[in-house]
Amino acid sequence: MANRMHCFDVTDPAAMKERLDPVSAQRFIGVARAAAEQSGFRPEEIRFVGMLHTKRSLFDQVMAALGIPPERQVYLDEYGHMSAIDPLVALYEAERRALLAPGDLAVLLSAGTGYTWAATAIRWGP
């Protein structure tokens, strides 16, 4: 604890952004597809993606690659980035806006500061 080995400090945010930008979209897309497949679905069956709040261009790129049309998207511009809860708030908004039907496949996407990306596949409904 005294040596701060228990946490990750970003000492150069600009350099980190420069390294993340070229890989983030493909990593988000890859983990989304893998989550669908590992859950017994085809990636084309994904009906909703709840994503960590990012810059709009990255969000748009991921949604387009996964085939999610604008009318089925939730971009958290009314909330802003709230950290790990972003995908859950997007899922809440999708449910509130009636974007999900029983049996739909929803995928939640997130990322960590240590160059990690993750996805969870959820079959919606009873």
Predicted segments with their positions:
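Condensing-enzyme catalytic core mediating Claisen C-C bond formation in acyl metabolism
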Residues: M1-Q26, G30, A111, W124-P126
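Short hydrophobic/aromatic-rich motifs at helix boundaries and adjacent loops
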Residues: N3-H6, G30-A34, F59-A64
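General structural feature for long, well-ordered alpha-helical segments within catalytic domains
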Residues: M16, S24-V31, R42, T54-L58, ...
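A short, structure-level motif marking secondary-structure boundaries and short turns
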Residues: M16-E18, P43-E45, Y75-L76
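Phosphate/pyrophosphate-binding loops at sites that engage ATP/ADP/AMP, CoA/4′-phosphopantetheine
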Residues: I29-E45, A94-L99
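Claisen-condensing/thiolase-fold acyl-transfer catalytic domains that form or cleave C-C bonds
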Residues: R47-P126
